[in-house]
Amino acid sequence: MDTTLEDVPAVIPLRSTALAKAVVEASLHAFVAADQEGLVYTDLKPSNVLLSGVDGPSPQAKIGDLGVMGPEGLNESWLQPEAFRAPEVWGSVSCYHKSDVWSLAALMLNWIDNGIVGNHDNNGSFPPMIWCLAKLMRLFATENNPIVPPSSTASKDLQLSFEYAKKLVSAARADNPKQYILDTPGFDEWAAAAEAADLIPKVVLDMIRFLAILDPANRPTAAQALVSNEFKALEAAAALESKG
């Protein structure tokens, strides 16, 4: 492999779906293999996505650093990089196979719009955990579909981070009370704007939306994602490009 996803920023407008398809496919297959062994990967991030042929019609992707895998059901609050951490891990439920699936949605979001998740735009005024969690809440949580908070038995640090993140979501800027400190949009708003401006192919947005389900009970497994209409559409778009 020649490089990593960390070193290959998306070029917006995103005119090719081939690299997106390669990353999604490699990640999902890695998650399926881990799940068959009762393991979770826990460490999907751009530097662990190995790439080759990125300038050609059929780029290849492979997931590296597989040695960090652990048994499914790890009850550890700090698993997964903060930018790509699943809601149930933030809530101290546990880290399961579907937590890996969430991390792929977050990874693709981060690749397409660097800073929409994670700590990139934090000026240091807030702890990274609080900043990352608040952005996750702004992107995906609603009044009727919130991120489940940690239980009373979770670590006090996590409980406090969750409470402070909730406050940060609606906190106004000191220099302009009409503006939020966080300018992160909701995912649907972001995706609609990206599609309307012809910045991101619909098949890529649909794939992310299919994976990024807050409730893990309703989130697809990696195996289900590989046979989904969303992945088939992404695959077909990439195949069409390679022929062209």
Model-derived features: positions:
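Conserved structural core of kinase catalytic domains
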Residues: 1-19
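Activation segment signature within eukaryotic-like protein kinase domains
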Residues: 23-24
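Catalytic-loop of the protein kinase fold
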Residues: 35-52
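Activation segment/activation loop of eukaryotic-type protein kinase catalytic domains
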Residues: 47-83
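Protein kinase subdomain VIII
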Residues: 80-93
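Conserved catalytic-loop aspartate of Hanks-type protein kinases
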Residues: 100
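C-terminal lobe substrate-recognition/regulatory segment of protein kinase catalytic domains
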Residues: 140-207
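Regulatory extensions flanking the kinase catalytic core
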Residues: 217-244
